[in-house]
């Protein structure tokens, strides 16, 4: 019988995010201040974003640690199954192995909570410090 789904055990879930910028030859240009057309500073961005989110956005480090609290929330619905698309492979008559992530198993049925959870975490962390 062919294996259709691969489910990563909880013990093997990532504890760090991979930052693709670290491997880019041509790194993205910094965001510009619309008034001055100059690169924005962390201080200017602090009016819109939590400090840790800004640091990550501007980081060139290859890996960024995922806070344990975020990892615990991820474990509620992850890991999402990696599914082999045998039917598509056959229809395309390709020797390639085609896989897709089935994000429908998450509470909202998509990947959006994967970024929403850490954004909310950092916003709550920094706003509760200021309160």
What feature does the model see in each segment?
Residues 126-131:
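Conserved small/polar residues in nucleotide/adenosyl-binding loops
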């Amino acid at each position: 019988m062919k294996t259709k789904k691969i489910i990563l055990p909880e013990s093997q879930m990532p504890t760090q995010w991979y930052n693709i910028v670290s491997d880019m030859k041509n790194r993205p240009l910094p965001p510009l201040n619309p008034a001055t057309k100059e690169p924005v500073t962390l201080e200017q961005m602090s009016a819109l974003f939590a400090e840790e989110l800004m640091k990550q956005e501007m980081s060139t480090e290859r890996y960024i640690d995922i806070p344990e609290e975020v990892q615990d929330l991820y474990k509620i619905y992850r890991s999402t199954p990696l599914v082999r698309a045998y039917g598509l492979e056959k229809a395309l008559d390709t020797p390639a192995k085609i896989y897709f992530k089935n994000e429908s198993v998450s509470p909202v049925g998509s990947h959006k909570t994967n970024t929403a959870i850490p954004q909310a975490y950092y916003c709550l962390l920094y706003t509760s410090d200021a309160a």
